[in-house]
Amino acid sequence: MIKAKKKIKKYKGIIFDLDGTLLDTIEDLTDSVNDVMQLYHFPQHDTKKCKMMVGNGFRKLITRALPEERQKDEQFVDEVLAQFAKAYHKRYLNKTVPYEGILQMVNELHKNGIQTAVNSNKRSDYTEALVNKFFAQTPMVAVYGERESKGIPKKPDPAAALEIADKMKLSSAEILYIGDSETDMKTGQNAGMDTIGVAWGFRGAEELKANHATYIAENPEDILKYIL
């Protein structure tokens, strides 16, 4: 009897974005932004608009949320950013949840020997706190948030992704980069990695297609089907 050949896994590691990919954080972010907008008597923003503001760190989020005539006042941005940090600290676990099917998907990846990591432009303390809260049972090779103060540039610079590849002891060709935005697709591409764009995230499939995602996943199960 001829035995069927065992499927060879091309990918042995995955790097995930956090907000809009693993976790739905938009309501807590929007509420925190609006707390600060209200404090300064500026117009409020809905979640749809906030989805287009996030992805490049808290400072960019706050700058984009401010009225245009105040966006270039760096000292004022610093002041508002400090207020946002206080508001988000109170709210960041209020409504944030993993997307449906995410926990099961990550667990299944680990059962199949796939290494995982998180690479986010979110502040490092919140990135680590959220991963510890929702993925405590899942070993991550690395959990990286924004580290510019340590000389590591933010996404889409590939520095953090390549650092994770070294930790995984894998080549870029063996790693998939998964996220929900142009920033994530460019990060993966800049690191020489194939990319999966998740259509359930903050930006949607059209932005992911326009930025040449290797594959578009409509749900977490699609990721498992693509990889395993």
Spans of features found by a protein language model:
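N-terminal helical cap/lid subdomain that shapes the substrate entry/recognition surface
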Residues: 2, 7-18, 22-104, 111, ...
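Glycine-rich phosphate-binding loop signature in dinucleotide/nucleotide-binding domains
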Residues: 8-9, 112-114, 168-174
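Short, glycine/polar-rich helix-capping loops at beta-to-alpha or helix-loop-helix junctions
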Residues: 200-209
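Substrate-recognition "cap/lid" segment bordering the active-site pocket of phosphatases
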Residues: 94-95, 123-176, 182-191, 205-206
